[in-house]
Amino acid sequence: MTMIFDKGNVEDFDKELWDAIHAEEERQEHHIELIASENMVSKAVMAAQGSVLTNKYAEGYPGNRYYGGTECVDIVETLAIERAKKLFGAAFANVQAHSGSQANAAAYMALIEAGDTVLGMDLAAGGHLTHGSPVNFSGKTYHFVGYSVDADTEMLNYEAILEQAKAVQPKLIVAGASAYSRSIDFEKFRAIADHVDAYLMVDMAHIAGLVAAGVHPSPVPYAHIVTSTTHKTLRGPRGGLILTNDEALAKKINSAVFPGLQGGPLEHVIAAKAVAFKEALDPAFKDYAQAIIDNTAAMAAVFAQDDRFRLISGGTDNHVFLVDVTKVIANGKLAQNLLDEVNITLNKNAIPFETLSPFKTSGIRIGCAAITSRGMGVKESQTIAHLIIKALVNHDQETILEEVRQEVRQLTDAFPLYKK
């Protein structure tokens, strides 16, 4: 009898699946990736995630499991926990959350009850689905009230948020965003929370790598709980992370994750998280994070200098920015689709006080973490901005679009993703 273990080559065993995987590898290699929530992991991260740890069930936590044979995964998970604590300067860390959404769900469970009032950033202003969208579990379970940005500056107005907090008296305030290009003042958010006797939770999923490197202010000293993903700017596997300095809350968080929300943790993913945390603890990671900041600022500046486009809030302090494209093309969806055709990948995005449907939007969102991982710098970032503009302005000129495709290929060839 042929054992399943003999089937070690995906290409030979499942050609149909392999072709799809290979096509995705080619897409990543030859497309410029500007989706702000995406990045490129190291081969070491992929190796850990593809290890034999995927075979092991380990309900519970290190030293307190429900199954036997967990002595090895206990070491793995403890490494991930200790590295996360060191990386972010936190007293406690939970590395079991499967995703950022589940990390947020666990934080809510640890802090508040169903039906409680929560003040979170409105999705249209740059917040995330899990910050109270009515179609999400957060909006269905809790009474979320959204805060926005200032209509003139398109930045957070902390005085206005304080007045809103006084009016609605939330049990919890959520800070953090998925499409906000400015630095967030977590100290001011904590002062607002203290003023109304609310908890403060910070979702730093997008900026975690920048925080780890010290190029963005850390929420850890101010928030009761900090949640994050481990991919995006942190450049690890897709997964979640929860941090706190409060021992009592740490116990509630652990109970909320298991058994509250999840069963067995994904120890192969936790191993990959441990690798990513070690990479982020390397001094070179600070250079990488600063390069993200520099590249994003350089790319945004190109749009700011072109009056056919409007840079939301006038600039960026982190890895992302939004651009209103409606002077040159009907909406963000058309812009996204057109740029896909020239092998530049980004996403349509609502802008503050959006007037178009969320399925169309007035803007596009651009992030520079992935191109920075490829080794691209300020010069290449400026070039990419000019290519985007060239394509959008000439969206009905196939000859010019072909020129853009060729220039994109030259760039990706010059900065290969995974060295052959």
From Swiss-Prot:
One of its GO terms (biological process) is tetrahydrofolate interconversion. It is found in: Cytoplasm. It catalyses: (6R)-5,10-methylene-5,6,7,8-tetrahydrofolate + glycine + H2O = (6S)-5,6,7,8-tetrahydrofolate + L-serine. GO terms for cellular component: cytosol. Pfam families: SHMT (PF00464). (6S)-5,6,7,8-tetrahydrofolate binds at residues 123, 127-129, 357-359. Homodimer. Belongs to the SHMT family. NCBIfam families: PRK00011.1. HAMAP family: SHMT. This is Serine hydroxymethyltransferase.
